[in-house]
Structure formats: structure tokens, C-alpha cells
């Protein structure tokens, strides 16, 4: 979140897709009650949110802090480490959500993209495609139909697995469909989906409500 100093310490090699917003990024309103608690039909719950871990061994000595201001980054040198604290107070802190904890919503026939929604902001939404059962009506066609997002640019980052509607898309690939451009499953993928029971895919989709510059 804006105005909070944070640091990621990966256990292994890490590649990151960064999504930045000038407006707050939050859980979808339809997943919450009037008090902000996630409801039972939400595809994830508060227990899935991972909070920071304090590591005192890192909080020593002088340190450089990179601060993003508008479209630039400035470096500030702190004489004392900002993590040299006992803890934090309040509810404003960095957090993590593992896409593997997203519980997919499925149906007898093909469900619309909003069932995959994970986060929302003023000008875009973030969706998670995860391993799930395919549509289970006897006559269902699991592959999505061709469509055109009249008011949205669509970006999909393919994290892992075999994406149900694409061919030749490898791990860490990105596809981009500008608003108004008709698109859908590649040739043969619709027929291939008929009779399939499940999909094994991990992907993150960003649908914007303004054109991407």
C-alpha cells in the first residue's frame, strides 16, 4: 500500500508482474457485508490473507529506501533501519494472497468472467484463473465463446499450467486484447474442451475500464 515501507525476501528465483494503481485496490464489494467482512460465497476469506513477518536480524544499520513519487523513483538513505521496531499498530500494512488459495466458482454451464474476480479498483479489476472443474451440464461446451470487450482492455498473464482456450502459450506469456477487438478460443480449442472434466491452469487477468497507455 501507498506510504508503507516494505521488502520482499524471496526463497527462490522470482519474477513479478507489477500492477500499480493511484486508487485503492480492494476486495470486490459483492464479496463483503456492510461491515467489510468477507461473506461465505466469497472465493477466499480473511484466513487466506498473509501478513508481514518481523525479522529483527534485517533491521540493523544504514539502509537505502526507494520511494516512488508519481512516475519516478527517489532514493532516501536512512541512518537507522525503518524495520527496527517492536511491531505495528493498526490495519494498514502490506499483505500477500496466494492464488492457490482462490476457491473457484463453477457451474453447469460456462460462468462469466466476474466469477474469477479477486480484487477491484476504480479503473480495473484483477481476476484469478485456477485449476477447477469444467462445466458439468451434459451438453455444455466448457471453452469460452468468442466475445468483444467493448469497454475494457484485457491482459492475461499465464503463470503455469495449460490454459484451456489457448495454443502455443507458454509459462510467463502475456496476451493483450484491446477494447473492441473480438477474440475467443484458438482453432480447435473449443472442440477439444468438449467432454473434458477439469482444467489445470493458473493465470492472472487484468480488465481495465480505460485504455492502457
Q: Whereabouts are the PLM-identified features?
A:
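Jelly-roll (double-stranded beta-helix
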Residues: 1-213
Amino acid at each position: 500500500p501507498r506510504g508503507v515501507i516494505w521488502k520482499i525476501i524471496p526463497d527462490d528465483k522470482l519474477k513479478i508482474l507489477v500492477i500499480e494503481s493511484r486508487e485503492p485496490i480492494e476486495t470486490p464489494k459483492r464479496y463483503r457485508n456492510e461491515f467489510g467482512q468477507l461473506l461465505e460465497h466469497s472465493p477466499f476469506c480473511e484466513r487466506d490473507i498473509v501478513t508481514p513477518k518481523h525479522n529483527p536480524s534485517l533491521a540493523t544499520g544504514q539502509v537505502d529506501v526507494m520511494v516512488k513519487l508519481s512516475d519516478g523513483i527517489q532514493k532516501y538513505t536512512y541512518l537507522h533501519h525503518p524495520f527496527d521496531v517492536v511491531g505495528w499498530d493498526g490495519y494498514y500494512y502490506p499483505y500477500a494472497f496466494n492464488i492457490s488459495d482462490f476457491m473457484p466458482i463453477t457451474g453447469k454451464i460456462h460462468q462469466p468472467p466476474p466469477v474469477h474476480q479477486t480484487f477491484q479498483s476504480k479503473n480495473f479489476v484483477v481476476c484469478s484463473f485456477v485449476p477447477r472443474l469444467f462445466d458439468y451440464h451434459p451438453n455444455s461446451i466448457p471453452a469460452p465463446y468468442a466475445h468483444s470487450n467493448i469497454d475494457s482492455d484485457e491482459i492475461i498473464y499465464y503463470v503455469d499450467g495449460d490454459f484451456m482456450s489457448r495454443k502455443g502459450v507458454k509459462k510467463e506469456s502475456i496476451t493483450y486484447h484491446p477494447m473492441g477487438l473480438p477474440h475467443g478460443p484458438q482453432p480447435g480449442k473449443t472442440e477439444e474442451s468438449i467432454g473434458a472434466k477439469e482444467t489445470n491452469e493458473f493465470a492472472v487477468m487484468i480488465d481495465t475500464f480505460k485504455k492502457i497507455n
